[in-house]
Amino acid sequence: MDFHRFFPAVTALAAFLPAMLRAEPPRPVTFSEDIAPLVFQNCTVCHRPGQIGPFALTDYESVKRRAKQIGEVTGDGTMPPWHADRGVVEYSNDRSLTPPQIALIADWVAAGTPEGDPAKTPALPLFPEGWQMGKPDLAATMPEAYLVPAEGKDIYRKFVIPLNLDQDRWVKGVEFRPGDPKVVHHILYYLDTTGKAREYDARDPAPGFRGMGQSNGEFRYLGGWDLGSQPTELPYGLRWFIPKGADLVVQINYHPNGRETTDQSSVGFHFSDEPTARPWSIIPVPPHFGMMQGIDIPAGAKEHLEEASFVIPEDCEAFAVNAHAHYLGKRMEMRATFKDGSTRWLLKTSNWDFQWQEDYIFQQPIKLPAGTRLDVLMSYDNSAENPNNPTHPPRRVVWGPFTTDEMGVITLSVMFDTREQKEATHQALRVFLANQVIDRLLEGDDSAMGPLGGGAALPGKAGPAKSLDAARSRLLALDFDKDSKLGPLERIPAIQFILQGSFIKNLGAIGFD
């Protein structure tokens, strides 16, 4: 042994022993210093009086009372609700807990939920009363309450709300307040500058008028709200535009819950004196909630896949992404493939939850050069083992407006440098949708074609078979080589035919004008 090296090491260790023995033991995990900051920041926004959380988490006693449950739902990732896979994409509004934070809660529960020094408990964040974004510049409320029955299928109803604007306005934020959040599932906003919505409303004796989607393309799509959506101001100086004299048309999807109730929802607008900093829009893949995707899920299918791709024709920057499906949705994924072959995730969620649909806002805008391909994969579980399956035993499920039907779309919010880039992207989306319409017509499956005929937007109503058959015959007449398909050259006049007719118009506008 080299004693010259051994003894200096022993001497050094001996010098440190007194300090090691005097070291403070680890501080126990307490509510005041460790748990309260996590709960107040990540949970209380929903778990407070008047919000969607079923109970409040606003102080030590309320959190202690639910401590075991909190430990369980944070441990399995159920709460806080955040369904994008961790570590794949960075989002600025990520409210999920990190593994160390989850372990901290588990340690606190295991230790018996000690409070610690109450003086060290942080103050609750300042939450606005009523409107989550603060008092709006304009609060628009449904003129009349609508009676929602206790039982029955989903209801799609449009309500006209006059805005009475005497000048054009730019809008930086919109907040929807459901009158009865227990029955309001999701909504779509439209603007009507034609007066048609008032005419439709006047013809219907009940408040509002029946319908899903746009009525013959008269209304301009503005946006929407789903369960789980949190209102936020548009980022990067972006704005919505509302022309003077426009009416707001709110399409509400009601889901009867066994109790008769009334709903009189409101929409709050926050105005901006500045116009939008850049043109912007949305890229839905596939368009219009997947209506022309041909979604057809066999009974018992454990993992039914639907895929769609769209090539972006112009340079743009993505700033947010959102997914939509119904109860059978399982995985929702969007990936960008660049022209050099490299790829980048935009959304990857392996645990889709119908009850929580929100915008995922990128930490930084993502540049998507012209020629970037957006690849979407949507997975559905129609097996008896799916606890969310609304039908037992499982049945075949196709596209439809009701929650027991299915939909599927991933929507990317993007910014452009010029309006010409934006319009070119809209036109590419119209062509994409026209190709899907052609595919469905040639397949002869009209299960999701009702709205194309101008009067059969909902199942059970007599379908426009004559117009669909006529359109199908017109397409087959373009099959010059008689192979029962339309090749690339044959599709050129077919696409022109679809775009010039009422088919795309009846499906509504693509993006924002």
Where are the language model's segments positioned?
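Secretory-pathway/luminal and periplasmic proteins that interact with or process carbohydrate-rich
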Residues: 45, 114-117, 257-259, 499-505
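Aromatic- and Gly/Pro-enriched helix-to-coil junctions and flexible linker segments
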Residues: 21-165, 173, 177, 245-251
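Bacterial N-terminal signal peptides
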Residues: 8-22
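A mature extracytoplasmic/lumenal domain signature
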Residues: 50, 61, 254, 338, ...
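Beta-strand-centric surfaces of beta-sandwich/beta-rich domains
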Residues: 81, 86-91, 121-170, 175-317, ...
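Calcium-binding acidic motifs and repeat modules
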Residues: 429-513
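Conserved beta-strand positions that form and line the central face of beta-propeller blades
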Residues: 30, 56, 233, 474-477
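N-terminal secretory signal peptides that target proteins for export/translocation
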Residues: 1-5
